[in-house]
Amino acid sequence: MSAASSMTGALDSCAPDFDGADVRLSFAGSDELAAQIRQGVRPDVYAAANSGLPAELNKEGLLSKPVDFATNELVIAVPRDSQVRSLGDLARGGMKLAIGSESVPVGSYTREVLSRLPGDEGDRILANVRSNEPDVKGIIGKLTQGAADAGFVYLTDVKVVGDSLRVVKLPAPLEPDVTYSAGVVKGAKQPDMAHEFLDGLTDGACADALAKAGFGAP
């Protein structure tokens, strides 16, 4: 299975409970995994941190009809002792920000939020970006290493890190719709088991693991 890196903890915990098969997981940015499928890599299941990439692969004949199986929340993550209290604080001069690259869902969601800000506030925040990362793990890494003052990640990512980071919520009108979607890859070696695992993302051990990790229901 190829899955967005933000699902690492949840899927690592539930995969061993899948009956009848040894589930091997590969985590990376959703866009990178989609590119691999387009280049001929054939995992049995593909799960992305948005609904757009699975829909594209389905349209290209590379993925079964996608199923929405979880939701998440885009937030600002900052070090525990940070003075950042709001989205507007990120526009201050001297701030060092880490965000997702434009092609990865977390980066796309971030730019969607910034595009909704009034005046030049979004541009001023983007001017403080020092790092465009390929996945949420890269953003969290910059924060925990002290290389960034703030970053846009998913709520579940901050929960995994523990007390070293805290969450700054986005204003409700700006929150993007973060929906996770998955499908069975055309040409999968184990299509029946792949569909069974896919079902388990919405009702089963993996659905329970996702809920425990803080993901919402679709």
Predicted regions, residues:
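A short beta-strand-loop structural module common to alpha/beta enzyme folds
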Residues: 22-31
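Exported/periplasmic ABC-transporter solute-binding proteins
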Residues: 1-17, 31, 35-39, 48-51, ...
